[in-house]
Amino acid sequence: MRFDVLTLFPEIPEAFFKTSIMAKAVEKGIISCNLVNIRDFAFDKHRSCDDIVYGGGAGMLLLPEPLSLALDSVNASSKRVIYVTPSGKPFNQELAKEFSSEEALVFVCGRYEGIDQRIIDEYVDDEISVGDYVMSSGELAALVIIDAVYRLIDGVISGESLEEESFSGFLLEYPQYTRPRNFKGKEVPEVLLSGHHLNIHKWRLKKRIEKTLKTRPDLIEKARNCGMWTKEAEKILKEFENE
């Protein structure tokens, strides 16, 4: 997969693509990244990319001309273009899976008051929000989405690891433990040391349901509606409800 990131500050995402699992995916050729500095397409000697908002109001807006040229430089018309904005559709694991099936994604990172609506109308396929809060940087929001997407691509992370993570099957992840067995008087649950795979599976499923019920009960209803809720899970849920 190819990621094109259009930004005024390429140094922000640059470090991410050179770090940890992402760096290995790039080295293997599974992922490619192209950081596009919008200022390279500005017209004046100051490389200006923003101006006042028509109709008044605080803040500045990114100019449409440099951004349009930047988008054309990555052949955006033939790719899926994502604009990260607080007013967009909420990002979730389902969208991450959908995006991971694309051959290329283009991210438009806004600053200040955002971007001209005409750019959105002309180029953008998806307006996406990473949460109900406002950030000063579209770059950070774009990296949240990229991180959730690239790890779902074949060859980046093992399938077993992905299957047991939070939101797999709409359940949150179970608690995990490592050495030592006793830490400040707290023991690792005995079942995890037993080597009995079926009992470990049951314990982990129970803990996933317990945590989801406590923290994100809405996900249980989603699992039911999508046909991903098993009889075993329903039995465990009833036990919690009867306690």
Curated annotation (Swiss-Prot):
Lineage top rank: taxon: Bacteria
GO cellular component terms listed in the entry, alphabetical order: cytosol
Record key words, sorted: Cytoplasm, Methyltransferase, S-adenosyl-L-methionine, Transferase, tRNA processing
Catalysed reactions, semicolon-separated: guanosine(37) in tRNA + S-adenosyl-L-methionine = N(1)-methylguanosine(37) in tRNA + S-adenosyl-L-homocysteine + H(+)
InterPro entries given in the database record: Alpha/beta_knot_MTases (IPR029028), tRNA_m1G_MeTrfase_C_sf (IPR023148), tRNA_m1G_MeTrfase_TrmD (IPR002649), tRNA_m1G_MTases_N (IPR029026), tRNA_MeTrfase_TRMD/TRM10 (IPR016009)
E.C. number(s) listed in UniProt: 2.1.1.228
Protein's name in the database: tRNA (guanine-N(1)-)-methyltransferase
Organism per entry: Treponema denticola (strain ATCC 35405 / DSM 14222 / CIP 103919 / JCM 8153 / KCTC 15104)
